[in-house]
Design a protein with these regions (language model features):
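A periodicity- and composition-biased signal for non-globular, repetitive helical segments
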Residues: 8-11, 34
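Bacterial N-terminal signal peptides that target proteins for export
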Residues: 1-8
Length: 271
């Protein structure tokens, strides 16, 4: 074996040992899951397993899937499915990524609470976020330039929204990219002309209101019966079947207690 290959192999072994050390669970990825839900699940899990030490980094679904490929986390949180390129990259390293659906979510359209708009059509949503429509008066609102707030490009929500609401078209050039759902809600809450999208767990922020899509609002019921158009599963990704602390946490998330926490936070349980 060449020296550089030996160094790489040794580093990989050391990294594997580092993240898998007893009692340590590294979880990276989706802000949708990692900003609220997973920390609460971790707190409840730790109450039953006090020796467990969590490291949670919620920086976007892309980072969670990359962490599994790069072996820097035992669980990758994601609000989207892994792309074919990511699956291939994992396979090239001998990793068979396994997705586990842990809860369902909806991406609701939010506007400032002072905005008189109460509902938009799917076509109007597409037109707004792609920049075809730039003034509220074009969709029944008061005259004024529309300010668009979206997630950033590392976010699974960013790509899911393009697919579900924009027919895979590009975002308007004026769209302002935010690091998380809470930031989108905060900006829309401060801007009377603002519009954005957030997950179910973030829809009760101050200064905003959730509007209907063709008259249907996002709720647990409309997610379950699939009448709300912008719904999606959320995932934990692991390298093959989870083991050790990762298995314990995945199992806990899917247990009745874990799913009850999902519901309390605002997600729709899988069971």
């Amino acid at each position: 074996m060449k020296l550089n290959q030996l160094i790489t192999a040794t580093a990989a072994i050391a990294l594997t040992a580092s993240i898998a050390q007893a009692g340590r669970l590294v979880i990276k990825g989706s802000d949708t899951l990692g900003a609220k839900l997973v920390p609460q699940l971790a707190e409840a899990y730790k109450a039953q397993n006090p020796a467990t030490k969590f490291e949670i980094a919620a920086e976007g679904s892309t980072t969670g899937i990359a962490a599994i490929i790069e072996n820097t986390a035992q669980i990758g949180m994601s609000s989207r499915r892994a792309k074919a390129t990511e699956i291939s990259a994992a396979s090239a390293k001998g990793i068979a990524m396994k997705p586990t659906v842990v809860a369902f979510d909806a991406m609701g359209v939010i506007v400032n609470s002072a905005n008189p708009i109460t509902s938009l059509t799917k076509k109007q949503v597409e037109q707004i976020f792609t920049g075809d429509v730039t003034d509220w008066s074009a969709v029944g609102g008061k005259p004024g330039k529309i300010s668009i707030y979206t997630r950033n490009t590392s976010s699974g929500t960013y790509s899911d929204w393009k697919e579900l609401a924009m027919k895979k078209r590009d975002y308007a050039g004026s769209a302002q990219k935010m690091a998380g759902h809470e930031q989108i809600a905060a900006e829309v809450g401060k801007n009377a002309s603002g519009i954005g999208y957030v997950g179910l767990a973030y829809m009760k922020a101050g200064g905003i209101k959730v509007i209907g899509i063709d008259g249907v609002v996002p709720t647990a019921a409309t997610v379950k019966n699939k009448t709300f158009p912008y719904s999606r599963p959320t995932f934990y990704y692991t390298s093959g079947d989870p083991s050790g602390e990762a298995k314990g946490f995945v199992d806990f998330t899917l247990s009745p207690k874990g799913q009850a926490i999902c519901s309390q936070v605002g997600f729709v349980p899988v069971n």
